[in-house]
């Protein structure tokens, strides 16, 4: 099937410039800023502990050991165990629906 062009393409003759006024944008930003400064946030103890620098629930030594084992081709995985867990999770999910 062939599609023939019925009329030639014409370029846009002129592009009209859009006049922008910064005052509405600035006014909106000022309103948002004033609303944001009046908010108060209180963190729970658990959240506060997570926000502290240097606190991590990730064992970086274990992560590095796993990376090294993967890189060296030494990581052994029990695919049967993984498959069984996936099936168990899927069954649990479907039963909860």
Swiss-Prot record:
Region (Disordered) residue spans: 1-40
InterPro entries linked: Anti-sigma-28_factor_FlgM_sf, FlgM, FlgM_C
Residue stretches of biased makeup (Polar residues): 13-27
Protein name: Negative regulator of flagellin synthesis
Domain comment (free text): The N-terminal domain is essential for export and the C-terminal domain possess the FliA binding site.
Keyword Transcription: yes
Protein role: Responsible for the coupling of flagellin expression to flagellar assembly by preventing expression of the flagellin genes when a component of the middle class of proteins is defective. It negatively regulates flagellar genes by inhibiting the activity of FliA by directly binding to FliA.
Family: Belongs to the FlgM family.
Signal peptide region: none
Pfam families (UniProt xref): FlgM
Single Gene Ontology MF annotation: molecular function inhibitor activity
Places the protein is found: Cytoplasm
Keywords for the protein's UniProt record, in alphabetical order: Bacterial flagellum biogenesis, Cytoplasm, Repressor, Transcription, Transcription regulation
Any single GO CC term annotated in Swiss-Prot or TrEMBL for this entry: cytoplasm
One annotated GO biological process: bacterial-type flagellum organization
Record's keyword annotation contains Transcription: yes
Originating organism: Salmonella typhimurium (strain LT2 / SGSC1412 / ATCC 700720)
């Amino acid at each position: 099937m062939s599609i023939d062009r019925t009329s030639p393409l014409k370029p846009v003759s002129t592009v009209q410039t859009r006049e922008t006024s910064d005052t509405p944008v600035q006014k909106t930003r000022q309103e948002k800023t004033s609303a944001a400064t009046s908010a108060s946030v209180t963190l729970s103890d658990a959240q506060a502990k997570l926000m502290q620098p240097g606190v991590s629930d990730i064992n970086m030594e274990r992560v590095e050991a796993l990376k090294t084992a993967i890189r060296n081709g030494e990581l052994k995985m029990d695919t049967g165990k993984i498959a069984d867990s996936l099936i168990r999770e899927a069954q649990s999910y479907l039963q909860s629906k």
